[in-house]
A protein has these predicted regions:
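Bacterial N-terminal signal peptides that target proteins for export
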Residues: 1-14
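C-terminal motif of bacterial Sec signal peptides marking the signal peptidase cleavage site
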Residues: 21-23
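Short, small/polar residue-rich loop motifs at catalytic or cofactor-binding pockets
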Residues: 273, 393-396, 457-459
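Noncatalytic scaffold domains of N-terminal-nucleophile
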Residues: 31-64, 68, 74-243, 248-293, ...
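Bacterial signal peptide processing site
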Residues: 25-27
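Extended C-terminal subregions enriched in glycine
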Residues: 405, 453, 486, 495-546
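Internal maturation/activation junctions in enzymes
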Residues: 212, 307-414, 428
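Active-site rim segments in enzyme catalytic domains, especially the processed small/beta chain
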Residues: 89-114, 260-262, 407-472, 496, ...
């Protein structure tokens, strides 16, 4: 049985998905132990392997849609668009057509890599005075003043124009079907709605918290207005969102609530193709987004780690975790001081990534004591920054695909906070993000709000190359935890010899502001005690939670070409391959 309105080409994968959803406490064991038995590390889920194509996405239905596209001969980008559309429907609090997106693209034929910045800009009215005249000392975290132009739809269209092969309208069919006819509410979705939906406006509460409670698990959730908007985008492309009826309704809605966006700001939006930043680490070339994202912090984190013998420290020992936490603080101090829209402010990337500078920075780690306050390496510390945030709300989805032609995409899209601005427009079904709340009003700061400026972004999709060929794609939701989780997983994979799934499932830390560190309870108590003795303020997190992101990866075996896809059990991500 399938849901009414779902594409028939997805039916064969329902059985496969059901098999894949069955978790295991440990890998399958042979019936009899051989004389030279291999030791298999326990893992929660299996690695998923294939030889033609693979996907990993933030929800099983999205992964299903992406694999169907690949099996129908589509490109990795085609699969990404299909998955992105579905995720906009089935994870509405985390991402959607009202949010932003970024992607990194590997061309299997040429080995070239390019990146797409799909973040939106502030409105023409968004001067510092616009906010200060309302007696604001900072931009609100929710509401109309927190909304910048949503860039995700333009990013889908621009990615498809360059790297897609299937008709764009066909790729949005699964998303339109789920929005119009409904999809089953999961336990995780109901929990997220319950915990994050209280700040929604009345239309948002009516849809996602009917009667004051989350929809029952297993019931069908519809957003027919969003289905209509997605159909407009499928039929009309850019005009269906940025210049037509949808743009007029969204701009009028925002203006009525006191925001700075107008219909002209929607019409002026465009994505930007950029060159990714590149850093060499552990015999791989790592590619990340340039500013306005925190990708530069990812590379500086890696470069500083070179000065420390990671393998000798040992996996998840107190010395290893302490070193990683302290290096993160140094990377984030520079990030918070300098990362902004390079079209509107000077971002000294070369200096921030200079190896000699970072070697000196790495030497600041005190092996015997955690640092509570860390200053940037140059430039004064910005007000209101503390080298990270404790917010762990569900705000982002990551998705990745590799196709039979050797092309790969590492993609991420987001509403920023859970349910973004809290504003659902009932006419269009669009939930608006709140990325515009990340501008600062601080005079002279590179990220100070200004007309037509992109805000600072935490979104960090990543890709790794080995001798010019694709090694793996990787990414995770989780705000400030993205940079931290990704380096821990890279170490697990390349230093400590774990499989992709093992690397993702291994216990992680998340350093927030000051001395605060969240740590998964699977880290031994003796290590917890040692970290406390070093001055870290530990919060021990039980079980598998979204605090530590929800990482996904596709790894290419350098000898056989076999694809191994992995997905984090901490959220709803699933991987499929064929």
């Amino acid at each position: 049985m399938m849901l009414q309105g779902q594409p028939s080409n997805l039916v064969p994968f329902i059985v496969a998905l059901a098999i894949g959803l069955t978790s295991c406490a440990a890998p399958d064991s042979p019936d009899s132990e051989s004389a030279t038995s291999t030791s298999y590390a326990p893992q929660n889920r299996p690695d998923v392997r294939g030889v033609n194509g693979a996907v990993s996405a933030g929800h099983p239905l999205a992964a299903q849609a992406g694999l169907a596209v690949l099996q129908d001969g589509g490109t990795a980008t085609d699969a990404i668009i299909a998955m992105a559309g579905v995720l906009a429907v089935v994870r509405p609090h985390m991402n959607g057509v009202g949010g932003d997106a970024f992607g990194i693209f590997f061309n299997g034929a040429t080995g070239n890599v390019t990146a797409l910045n799909g973040s939106g800009r502030s409105g023409a009215l968004a001067t510092p005075e616009f906010f200060k005249n309302q007696n604001l000392s900072e931009i609100p975290g929710t509401g109309a003043l927190s909304v910048s132009v949503p860039g995700a739809v333009a990013a889908w269209l621009d990615a498809h124009e360059r790297f897609g092969s299937k008709p764009f309208s066909q790729l949005l069919e699964p998303a339109i079907g789920y929005a119009t006819n409904g999809f089953p509410v999961s336990k995780r979705l109901a929990q997220d709605f319950e915990s994050q939906g209280r700040a929604l406006n009345e239309p948002g509460k009516q849809l996602y918290l009917p009667g004051g409670n989350a929809p029952l698990i297993g019931t069908l959730l519809k957003n027919e207005a969003l289905g209509t908007t997605l159909q407009r985008i499928a039929n009309e492309g850019r005009e269906g969102f940025y210049t037509g009826e949808v743009a007029k309704r969204l701009a009028g809605f925002i203006e009525e609530l006191g925001g700075h966006l107008r219909v002209e700001d929607f019409a002026a939006h465009s994505s930007t193709w950029v060159s990714p930043l590149r850093g060499d680490y552990l015999n791989h070339s790592f590619l990340v987004m340039p500013p306005n994202t925190q990708g530069v912090a990812q590379l500086s984190y890696m470069e500083m780690a070179k000065a420390h013998s990671i393998k000798s420290l040992g996996h998840n020992t107190a010395s290893y975790l302490h070193t990683m936490i302290e290096l993160k603080k140094l990377a984030f101090a520079d990030r918070d001081r300098w990362v902004a829209d390079p079209d509107k402010a000077h971002v000294p990337i070369d200096r921030l990534l200079n190896p000699e500078y970072l070697l000196d920075r790495s030497a600041l780690v005190d092996a015997n004591r955690a640092a509570e306050q860390v200053e940037p390496g140059f430039g004064s510390k910005s007000s209101g920054t503390d080298n990270g945030s404790a917010d762990d709300s569900g705000d982002t989805v990551y998705l990745t695909a590799v196709d039979q032609f050797g092309n790969a995409v590492s993609w991420i899209q987001s509403n920023f906070a859970g349910f973004g601005s809290g504003l659902l427009n009932s006419e269009t079904g669009v939930l608006l993000h709140n990325r515009g709340s990340l501008y600062t009003l601080e005079d002279g700061h590179p990220n100070q709000v200004a007309p037509g400026k992109r805000p600072y972004h935490t979104l960090t999709p990543m890709m790794a190359l080995n001798n010019g060929g694709l090694a793996f794609t990787i990414g995770t939701p989780g705000g400030d935890s993205q940079t931290q989780s990704l380096l821990q997983i890279v170490h697990n994979l390349l230093v400590f010899g774990m499989s992709p799934q093992e690397a993702i499932e291994a216990p992680r830390f998340r350093s927030s502001g000051g001395l605060s560190v969240s740590l998964e309870d699977r880290v031994p108590f003796s290590v917890q005690a040692s970290l406390t003795g070093l001055g870290h303020d530990l919060q021990i997190i039980q079980g598998w939670t979204a605090t530590f992101g929800g990482a996904q990866m596709i790894y290419v075996d350098p000898d056989t070409g076999t694809l191994t896809a992995a997905a984090d059990p901490r959220r709803e991500a699933y991987a499929l391959a064929y």
